[in-house]
Amino acid sequence: MSQVSICLLSEAGADPGALSILAERWGLVSDEQSIMALVLTPERLELRKRDEPKLGGIYVDFVAGTLAHRRKFGGGRGEAVAKAVGIKKGYLPRVVDATAGLGRDAFVLAALGCHVQMLERNPVVAALLDDGLRRGYQDAEIGPWLRERLTLLHASSLTALAEIEPRPEVVYLDPMYPHRQKSALVKKEMRVFQSLVGADEDADGLLAPARALATKRVVVKRPDYAEPLAGIAAQAAVTTKSHRFDLYMPLL
């Protein structure tokens, strides 16, 4: 993985030595001119857009906030993502989430009992995920099962999908796509994320290796207005008001 330049900041009360360890681990080079900043606070690691401070920080939190609410009060196995990967009574597929992002869908699947391996190639996003996992693993309530079911591999999906063993039943893809939704959360996250990583220009190339790896199905999450990944029509789909989960059979 090549090095990435980003402004690295440590707030008062945070361990000052932790930032240099983090930079070395993830191949980050501090650039004080960068508009993107990775900020170590006493509580967590955050990504901030320095020229738009009102956007606040983006961070991964598996313990509290929206994911905790979704785990406790969401649709459970009735959630569209659960239906899409094929969760049924007595069947919990092993899943590779090849475009992990902030890990939301991966966490939902892990909370339902699936073993999920997240792949994330961007070192800044991987660092945020790793920080969220570390705090989640330490939590008394979710830590025991989270450690067992949700893991992270910092790698390019294009290469990792050809090397993962054993083969999972499901490969899950949610490549970044320009959002039309105007919700505050989506706007904030998309603006910060697209400033950091840009669009997934090579996303079309993920479908074939994903279908070669999965033993049961590939699930591709798309906005309802988006064309199929790689222009290949899905064999089935699970739809919601704003998204669809396109389903593809493996390439045997």
UniProtKB/Swiss-Prot annotation:
Keywords: Cytoplasm, Methyltransferase, rRNA processing, S-adenosyl-L-methionine, Transferase. GO terms for cellular component: cytoplasm. Its EC number is 2.1.1.242. It comes from the Bacteria. It is found in: Cytoplasm. The keyword Cytoplasm applies. It catalyses: guanosine(1516) in 16S rRNA + S-adenosyl-L-methionine = N(2)-methylguanosine(1516) in 16S rRNA + S-adenosyl-L-homocysteine + H(+). Disulfide bonds: none annotated. The keyword DNA-binding does not apply. It is an enzyme of class 2 (transferase). S-adenosyl-L-methionine binds at residues 104-105, 120-121, 156-157, 174. SUPFAM superfamilies: S-adenosyl-L-methionine-dependent methyltransferases. InterPro entries: 16SrRNA_methylTrfase_J, SAM-dependent_MTases_sf. Its main location: cytoplasm. GO terms for molecular function: rRNA (guanine-N2-)-methyltransferase activity. Belongs to the methyltransferase superfamily. RsmJ family. Specifically methylates the guanosine in position 1516 of 16S rRNA. NCBIfam families: PRK10742.1 (NF008012). This is Ribosomal RNA small subunit methyltransferase J.
